[in-house]
């Protein structure tokens, strides 16, 4: 009986988080760099809060007052969420670090872990039914490239993984056909 109650509680919490994400994505008041990065930082902190993975955030006190389209926010959020999920699912990490910066006209979000890593030089299969096909990495890359950015993955077996999302701010205001 207690397992069922815990399961219902976990499911309810997941539904509430999903609803919060939907409301955030569709609210036009959040169409700024400052709102987006603040939300992403808080989301990362909350995401790891009950997991045993220590999470450090490196976020500037203030971000430039730059608009972001809702599509860009949505794709950026889903890519970052996938990177965080990969840390929990695959890395066996005890520590994560999320860094957010605006440099050289770009938004840069770096998600690092101290987990087991993988051979990032190994070819990625295109077989979507294969368990080792790196669907999450492919999805993150597609989401970010669809909004004009790039996703850089660096990983070494035994040393962890770093995923860097780079988004030119000049394209971040445009609605994109995806």
Segments the model singles out, each with a brief description of its role:
Residues 1-178:
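Coiled-coil dimerization/phosphotransfer module
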């Amino acid at each position: 009986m207690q397992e069922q109650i815990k399961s219902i509680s976990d499911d309810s919490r997941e539904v509430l988080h999903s609803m919060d994400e939907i409301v955030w994505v569709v609210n036009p008041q959040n169409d700024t760099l400052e709102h987006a990065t603040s939300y992403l930082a808080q989301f990362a902190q909350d995401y790891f809060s009950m997991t045993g993975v220590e999470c450090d955030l490196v976020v500037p006190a203030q971000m430039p007052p730059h608009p972001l389209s809702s599509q860009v926010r949505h794709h950026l959020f889903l890519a970052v969420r996938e990177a965080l999920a990969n840390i929990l699912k695959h890395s066996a990490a005890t520590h994560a670090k999320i860094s957010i910066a605006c440099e050289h006209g770009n938004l840069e979000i770096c998600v690092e872990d101290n987990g087991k890593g993988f051979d990032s030089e190994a070819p990625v299969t295109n077989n979507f039914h294969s368990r080792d096909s790196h669907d999450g990495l492919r999805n993150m890359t597609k989401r970010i490239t669809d909004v004009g950015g790039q996703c850089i993955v660096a990983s070494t077996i035994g040393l962890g993984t770093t995923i860097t999302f780079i988004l030119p701010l000049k394209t971040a205001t445009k609605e994109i056909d995806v």
